[in-house]
Regions:
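Short catalytic/metal-binding and nucleic-acid-binding patches
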Residues: 1-179
């Protein structure tokens, strides 16, 4: 097992990819109402600012700004996963091995998640663009504006993006692989 060390910064800005255990499932969209409830509950107990989010059937991308006095993004991800898992019908629960059972896991999520500490404005811009273009990359829609499960529409209303953004994407964005 690799010796991976995460970078923790109070008030840090992070990009995450969080993935279902079974990538063939569509539970994040099928149970979007349950996911939204789990997300709100997580924010109530472990606040953070959602800079950008895109929810796909089997994984999600999230850019999170932590509070100034807090660097514990791992706890927030853990609580979000748990809150969502508990809301799913029992038939969604995965195959249990002894290790997962001891940890109280329900077999919904991959244990780990991908995390990237965002270093500057240019890095942030690339991550946001990647997140919003992801449904097109995965062939769920042909235009970014057609994907309902992202904060893209909020950012259009705020004037950060034109609603037609992503109709003709830069080759740089389409080559990024952050899944």
């Amino acid at each position: 097992m690799p010796n991976y060390r995460r970078y923790f910064e109070k008030g840090g800005l992070y990009f995450f990819t969080i993935t279902l255990q079974d990538r063939q499932k569509n539970w994040l969209i099928k149970y979007i109402h349950e996911f939204k409830l789990a997300y709100r509950e997580t924010l109530q107990h472990y606040p953070f600012e959602t800079i950008a989010i895109c929810i796909l059937p089997d994984h999600l991308h999230l850019i999170m700004q932590l509070p100034e006095n807090d660097d514990n993004f791992s706890r927030r991800i853990q609580v979000l996963k748990s809150n969502f898992s508990k809301r799913l019908p029992k038939e969604c629960y995965g195959v249990f091995n002894l290790s997962r059972k001891k940890r109280g896991e329900l077999g919904i999520w991959q244990r780990r998640f991908w995390e990237h500490h965002i270093r500057d404005e240019n890095d942030l811009e690339k991550c946001i663009e990647y997140i919003y273009y992801n449904p097109v990359k995965h062939n769920y829609v042909t235009n970014v504006k057609d994907w309902a499960f992202s904060s893209f529409h909020r950012d259009v209303k705020l004037g950060f993006f034109d609603k037609e953004w992503g109709s003709e994407i830069s080759p740089i964005i389409s080559k990024l692989n952050l899944d």
